[in-house]
């Protein structure tokens, strides 16, 4: 009788090219790479003498990373799949997805099955497993609003752990996994709580304008209407990484205190801003970058997109160092002109 396959077996790919595994399309290489299709492979890493002592990097869609050099370690390509309704109650569905699932496809799947809530996050690049790390957000919604829990493997021990929202310590484009947990865990699956009573989030004018342009009253919009509107907006504003390498929004929208904002507003009355519940004010980073004259400009093969100043692009052949140099030049000009610090969203390695 043939032996069943070993789900923990790890097939190593030496000197593996990474251009196809990051949305910037930056040409870098990993000492080793391995495709992970089952949680047991994460759990067995610490027992594999070939790679146990190497640095590890988990990659999903590669939409939140900029390689400035080759990676002298093991890149784990998270391809763990699966989507299912774990349970439901009177108020909500609890939906689990594998860490390697494509995020946009997962959002579409929830709507196809009558479970709304995530539609404002349509077309964000990357995987389900990357979504909590970054606490992705768009058009008035952040992922943690519908987050229930996740399962992650501690790579050094192979131990699986469940994290609730409090333990994930979500912040604006931030979480425990970007700080203290960075590089220590691989996210195997994420569970979302999607309410059975849908509450549309239409606070962004771009979304309501797109709905109205489609002949849809915002008051009558369905979850699918919002999904389609968000997809149309993002496609109009953001380049397709398959055609022009990019990582989506490169900088976080900075949040400043009210006193700083009042002083800034006096100097720049047209500044685009969004009041926050805690009294602080979020600024539109794209507006700041545009006002510094960077939209459409380039440094070498790295450039600022000509339609969306928040997006840096690879015009062809850009290195990670090129992208980083462009980002630093933009940060310098925004700091000089507005006294505001811009923080990159992607991790630069």
Curated annotation (Swiss-Prot):
Its EC number is 1.3.1.98. The active site is at residues 173, 249, 345. The keyword Cytoplasm applies. GO terms for molecular function: FAD binding; UDP-N-acetylmuramate dehydrogenase activity. Its cofactor is FAD. It catalyses: UDP-N-acetyl-alpha-D-muramate + NADP(+) = UDP-N-acetyl-3-O-(1-carboxyvinyl)-alpha-D-glucosamine + NADPH + H(+). One of its GO terms (cellular component) is cytosol. Signal peptide: none annotated. Residues 25-197 form the FAD-binding PCMH-type domain. Pathway: Cell wall biogenesis; peptidoglycan biosynthesis. GO terms for biological process: cell division; cell wall organization; peptidoglycan biosynthetic process; regulation of cell shape. Belongs to the MurB family. This is UDP-N-acetylenolpyruvoylglucosamine reductase.
């Amino acid at each position: 009788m043939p032996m069943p396959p070993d789900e923990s077996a790890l097939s190593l790919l030496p000197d593996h090219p990474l251009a196809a595994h990051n949305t910037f399309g930056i040409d870098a290489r990993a000492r080793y790479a391995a495709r992970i299709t089952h949680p047991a492979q994460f759990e067995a890493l610490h027992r594999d003498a070939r790679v146990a002592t190497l640095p590890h990097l988990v990659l999903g869609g590669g939409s939140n990373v900029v390689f400035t050099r080759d990676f002298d370690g093991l890149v784990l390509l998270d391809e763990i799949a699966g989507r299912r309704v774990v349970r439901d109650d009177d108020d909500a569905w609890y939906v689990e997805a594998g860490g390697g699932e494509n995020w946009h496809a997962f959002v579409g799947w929830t709507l196809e099955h009558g479970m709304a809530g995530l539609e404002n996050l349509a077309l964000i690049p990357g995987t389900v497993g990357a979504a909590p790390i970054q606490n992705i957000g768009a058009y008035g919604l952040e992922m943690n609003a519908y987050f229930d829990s996740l399962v992650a493997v501690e790579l050094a021990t192979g131990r699986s752990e469940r994290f609730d929202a409090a333990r994930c310590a979500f912040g604006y484009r931030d979480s425990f996994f970007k700080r203290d947990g960075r590089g220590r865990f691989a996210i195997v699956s994420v569970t979302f709580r999607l309410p059975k009573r849908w509450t549309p989030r239409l606070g962004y004018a771009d979304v309501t304008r797109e709905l109205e342009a489609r002949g849809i009253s915002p008051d009558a919009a369905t979850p699918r209407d919002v999904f389609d509107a968000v997809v149309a907006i993002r496609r109009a504003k953001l380049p397709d990484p398959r055609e022009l390498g990019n990582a989506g929004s490169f900088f976080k929208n900075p949040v400043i205190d009210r006193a700083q904002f009042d002083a800034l507003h006096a100097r720049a009355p047209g500044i685009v801003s969004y009041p926050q519940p805690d009294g602080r004010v979020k600024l539109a980073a794209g507006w700041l970058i545009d006002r510094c004259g960077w939209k459409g400009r380039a440094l070498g093969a790295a450039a600022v997109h000509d339609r969306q100043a928040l997006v840096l692009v690879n015009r062809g052949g850009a290195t990670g160092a090129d992208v980083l140099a462009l980002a630093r030049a933009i940060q310098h000009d925004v700091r000089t002109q507005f006294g505001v610090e811009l923080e990159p969203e992607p991790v630069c390695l």
